[in-house]
Every structure is written in C-alpha cells, then in structure tokens.
C-alpha cells in the first residue's frame, strides 16, 4: 500500500515507487493477521457479515473501519471522465506516468502543455511544485526558467493553505509565484471537460491534464450500510473510537469524525489514532472498559516544495528551507521502514488474556508456527491431527471454511 507522505518526493523523482510502498503481506504475517484483497460490496451490520466481490462472505464480531477519504471534487460533473483524483494513489500514479512523457515531449519541443490542479491545500501545492520540478529536470531546464509548461492551481478558497498560519501561506504563495505557477483563488469548479476546466464564474481554463486534490469526503457506502454519519459528512465516532450507531463498529483516520474533537483530515492525526484504536479493540474483545482518545489540537505539517526544500508549519509558526525537507525525509523514510523492516517472527503464541478460552489457547500453542505461509509447509503430524478431528464429507463450498477436509472417493 502506498504511503501518501512520500508521494511528492516520488513525483519529483527522489523516491522510487517501491520506496513509498509498504508491503502488507509480511506485515500481516508478522501481526498474525490475514490480508484479503477484495472490494467490500456490502456490510450487513445486523448479521455481522461483510460481503466481498468474488469471495465468500466474512463473519465478524468486531469491525474497524479505516477506509480513508476521497477528494470531494469527485462529485463534480465530468470528474470520472476528464480528471484524476490524488486518491487512490495507485490510480493517480498510473495517470501521472502517462502524463509525464507527454509533457516532456511537448516542453522539449517548446510546445505548450497545460496541467491544472484543483484544490488549494497542501496536496495541490506539493503536486504542482513536484510536477514542475520533474518535467523541467527531464527537459534539462533550470527550475525557475520560463518554459512552455503551464501549471495552474484553481481553488474555491480565498487563500492558499487556508488552514495554516500566515507565514506558511505567504511562503507557499511566494514560491509558486517565483516558479511561475498560476494560482486562481475564489473560483469554484463547475464542470470538468475534455481539454478544459469550467468554473462557476464562467472561466474556461485549457488543460491537457487535470488533477484534483480538494477537501476530503466520505464514500457513500458507510451510510448505505446504516452506519451513523456526523453533521460534517463523516462517520460519527465517540472518543472511544466506537461509532455512535454501533458499539461493535470502530472507525479512525480520515473516515471518522470524533465527537468534540474535530480535526483536519491529515495523515498525522490518522497515524496518532492507531495505538488508541488497537488498545480499545483489544479492550472491547476482552470485556474491559474502553479509554477515550483526544487527538492533539495542532500537528506539525511538512509541505514539500518539490526541490529538496519544504515548509514546516505548526499553528502560527513556520519556516522554509532544506532543514524542513530533511525533517520530512527522515520522518517519511522512518515510517515506511518501521512497517517494512520487521524483526524476526516469534514462534511463541502471544494472545491477550481473555481473548479465547483455555482449551482453544492450548490447542493453538501446540501448533504455534514461525511461518503462517502456504500450508504446504505444514508437517504431516499436524495435518493428521486436523484431519482426524474433522468429520467425513466435504464442507459446502459456499461456507467460508478453510480447514482441511476428508473427501470420500
């Protein structure tokens, strides 16, 4: 799964795609969990069943939703056909890989090439500056030189980086202006068209490639499943990270809005919710009292400027330069490494007390494995024990059963 914090450096060409990705398979094995790559078609909260596309349904006792958000410009007419959102990141990178050679070819031939990015937040600023840096670098042009590349940021907001302090806003605006990136504020996009973007003020902006990184919104399916939605359009969540509508459903990250502690949709807040969420999931499973979580009010933001410099912004304080970039690089690389360079797996079974009964725990400990891999590695003794315990006759293929079974011939 891609780590969004490394996206600007990947666009600039400083990181490879592999360096920004976290492989969930070894991580899941390390955590003694399973990864299922399938889209959830529906969640039956009454029966506690998740229906998956192309797979048997999954029963659950506790559900945790960490589904993120999507740019709200996805609701604008023409978004699906003529514009590309920054999320999902894999989809964005596929589009960028097709745009990059086209832009380089046009600019190298001194032909106009226009890129429009809709949205006035950090993501739009980072994308615009990183794209320009990469294209100019590929064309062997100086960063601030005039070229036939035209990049524009269009936002309905009256300010760039509206949720940041005045110093950070001015630093970003100065950088964009110095690098000849056009900034159109107070213009709400009305429609995405083939080759242009139309605003409500009837401004028509020519575009060879259109991207959007607007404010966050929640997909429609949680509400359709019956999960309570807050006034701001996200999953209504209690301080314990339980949803207000269902005590056995938890939510965190961009998808959730914690009552009494609304925060900007930022990866910093999502990451900080990870440990409190894990703790409360275990507490709920073992019948213990849950602990409320109150996220910090302000967080450090590091906004990449595409050229190995960045803006550091915390509340009203801000500074710009290579030090901020070095801080961002260190944080991003350490985050990816933390979930990629894993210690050796322990054979000893480590379970929270009260999670299962003593008999089940004893059985699991007898078969604790260093690898939870392909199943062909299972020893003959263990396989024989399992087969002896199963009744004769194959289980129905419609049931979500994955144990071995004796099939009479």
Regions found by a protein language model. Give the residues of each.
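A Rossmann-like FAD-binding core segment of flavoenzymes
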Residues: 35-42, 133-239
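C-terminal auxiliary extensions adjacent to catalytic cores
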Residues: 307-362
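A conserved FAD-binding loop/helix module that cradles the flavin
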Residues: 255-306
């Amino acid at each position: 799964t891609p780590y969004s914090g490394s996206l600007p450096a990947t666009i600039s060409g400083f990181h490879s795609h592999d360096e920004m990705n976290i492989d969930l398979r070894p991580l899941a094995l390390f955590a003694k969990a399973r990864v299922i790559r399938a889209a959830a078609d529906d969640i039956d909260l009454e029966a506690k069943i998740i229906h998956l596309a192309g797979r048997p349904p999954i029963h659950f006792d506790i559900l945790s939703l960490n589904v993120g958000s999507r740019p709200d410009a996805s609701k604008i007419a023409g978004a699906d056909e003529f514009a590309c959102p920054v999320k999902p990141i894999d989809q964005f990178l596929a589009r960028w890989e097709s745009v990059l050679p086209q832009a380089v070819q046009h600019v190298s031939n001194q032909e106009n090439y226009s890129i429009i990015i809709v949205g006035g937040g950090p993501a739009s600023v980072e994308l615009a500056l990183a794209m320009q840096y990469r294209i100019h670098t590929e064309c062997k042009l100086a960063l601030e030189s005039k070229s036939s590349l035209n990049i524009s940021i269009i936002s309905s907001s009256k300010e760039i980086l509206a949720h940041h302090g005045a110093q950070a806003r001015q630093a970003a605006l100065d950088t964009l202006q110095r690098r000849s990136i056009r900034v159109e504020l107070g213009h709400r996009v009305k429609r995405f068209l083939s080759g242009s973007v139309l605003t409500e003020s009837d401004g028509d902006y020519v575009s060879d490639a259109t991207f959007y990184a607007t404010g966050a919104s929640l997909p429609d399916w949680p509400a359709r499943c019956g999960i309570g939605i807050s006034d701001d359009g996200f999953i209504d969540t209690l301080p314990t990270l339980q949803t207000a509508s269902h005590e056995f459903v938890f939510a965190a990250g961009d998808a959730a809005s914690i009552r009494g502690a609304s925060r900007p949709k930022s990866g910093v807040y999502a990451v900080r919710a990870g440990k409190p969420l894990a703790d409360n999931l275990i507490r709920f499973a073992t019948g213990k009292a849950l602990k409320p979580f109150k996220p910090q009010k302000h967080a450090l933001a590091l906004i990449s400027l595409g050229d190995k410099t960045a803006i550091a912004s915390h509340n009203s304080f801000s500074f710009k330069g290579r030090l901020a970039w070095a801080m961002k690089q260190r944080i991003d690389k350490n985050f990816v490494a933390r979930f990629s360079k894993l210690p050796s797996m322990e054979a000893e079974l480590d379970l929270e007390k009260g999670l299962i009964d003593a008999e089940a725990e004893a059985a699991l400990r007898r078969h604790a494995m260093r690898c939870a891999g392909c199943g062909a590695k299972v020893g003959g003794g263990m396989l024989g024990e399992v087969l002896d315990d199963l009744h004769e006759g194959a289980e129905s293929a419609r049931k979500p059963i994955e144990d071995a079974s004796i099939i009479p011939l």
